[in-house]
C-alpha cells in the first residue's frame, strides 16, 4: 500500500496523439518525511508517521518541535500515519512512489459553502415567481409536520433544511495516474479531485479496482510515456 500527502494545484489538460483532450488534476507533492515507525510489538499496530509541508518554528508548540527534533526533521504543518507502509525514520517519500498507468484513491475535503439555503444545498425547486407570489421565492415551505393526532409534533432528524454545506471528507476511487514529473514533484491524475486549490490531498494506491482503463487513446498515451521514460534512462 503506497500513500502520499500532496497539495492540489489546479486542473489542466493533456493531449493524446490524436488530439483528444483529457482533463487532469495537478498535485504537488513535497517529499513526505518519515518521523516515526509504529510496530506491533510496541504500539499494537504497524504504521509510519510522516510530516508534510515545512513551516517556521514559531508556528508550532514546544512538544511538536521536540518531536521533530527527535526525528531530525524540519518542522512540518501536517502529521499523518500511513498503515501497511514500510520505511525507515528519516526517509523521504516522493512522487516516484507512483507511476503512470496506476490507479489511486484521492481523499480530500470538498469546498466549503458555509450556511446555505435548501435550494442550493438540496436542489429544491424555487417558489412561484409570478406577480402576487410574495417574498418567499427561496423558502423551504411546508415540511409536513402536523399538530396532534397521529402526526409527529417535532422535526425529524435528517429533514432537508438550510444548514452547513460542503467541507466534507470525500474519497474518489480508481483515478488514473497520467504522468509523474519527479523533477518538479508533480503528479497528474485523470479527472477531478475534491477540494479547492491549495487543499491537502491524500493519495493511496487503489484497493478495489472496479474497472480497467479501456480508452485506447489514453492507453496509447500511457504507453508512449513509458517508452519515452525508458529511452531517457
Curated annotation (Swiss-Prot):
TM ranges: none
A single Pfam family, by name? Answer: Ribosomal_L3
**Keyword vocabulary terms for this entry:** Ribonucleoprotein, Ribosomal protein, RNA-binding, rRNA-binding
UniProt GO MF annotations: rRNA binding; structural constituent of ribosome
Q: Which GO terms describe its cellular component?
A: cytosolic large ribosomal subunit
Q: Which GO terms describe its biological process?
A: translation
Please describe what this protein does. Answer: One of the primary rRNA binding proteins, it binds directly near the 3'-end of the 23S rRNA, where it nucleates assembly of the 50S subunit.
Name the family. Answer: Belongs to the universal ribosomal protein uL3 family.
Q: How does it assemble?
A: Part of the 50S ribosomal subunit. Forms a cluster with proteins L14 and L19.
| NCBIfam families reported in the protein's UniProt record | L3_bact
This protein is called Large ribosomal subunit protein uL3
Q: Which organism is it from?
A: Ureaplasma parvum serovar 3 (strain ATCC 700970)
Q: Encoded by which gene?
A: rplC
